[in-house]
A protein has these predicted regions:
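N-terminal helical cap/lid subdomain that shapes the substrate entry/recognition surface
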Residues: 2-9, 13-94, 102, 115-118, ...
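A short, structured active-site edge motif that brings together acidic residues
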Residues: 44, 127-142
Length: 152
């Protein structure tokens, strides 16, 4: 039996694609940009929100300054709508409860912004379920997040 299990968040524990897609489309609509079907966003996600923003932004709107502004706008919209449709996948709450009952320690590491990762985990799961929840932190390389969780 495993002693510890590390989980990704989006697309693993929680189905977040609808809220991500809807938020992206709200940003696109505000700029008069093309909007995409939710199914298309499945190809846009997986490498963090900055990459998602780059992928839904038109090619002529991808300068570093434009992407930074669009990212800030997306964060604001998503922060207001990240609980609209998000839900745990079927069977996930039961799986996590069984692992916890078996004494398995669990953690969540996500490329979602840390504040958003913590917020959705707190909303959908018991507070004592995970030993640690970490999302992407500004100026911290993704692979370094595992080191943040190590005891000092």
């Amino acid at each position: 039996m495993y002693k510890t299990v590390l989980f990704d968040l989006d697309g693993t524990l929680l189905n977040t694609i609808d809220d991500l897609a809807d938020s992206a489309n709200r940003v696109c609509a505000a700029h008069g940009w093309p909007q995409y079907e939710t199914a298309q966003y499945r190809y846009f996600v997986g490498n963090g929100i900055p990459k998602l923003v780059e992928r839904f932004s038109p090619a002529d709107c991808r300068s570093p300054a434009q992407l930074a502004a669009t990212l800030a706008e997306f964060d604001q919209v998503y922060g207001a709508h990240m609980h609209d449709k998000t839900a745990p996948y079927p069977g996930i709450p039961e799986l996590l409860a069984r692992l916890k009952a078996a004494g398995v320690k669990m953690a969540v590491f996500s490329n979602k912004a840390d504040e958003f990762a913590r917020a959705v985990v707190a909303r959908y799961f018991d507070a004592d379920l995970f030993e640690i929840v970490r999302g992407a932190l500004p100026d911290v390389p993704t692979l370094s997040l595992i080191h943040i969780s190590e005891p000092t």
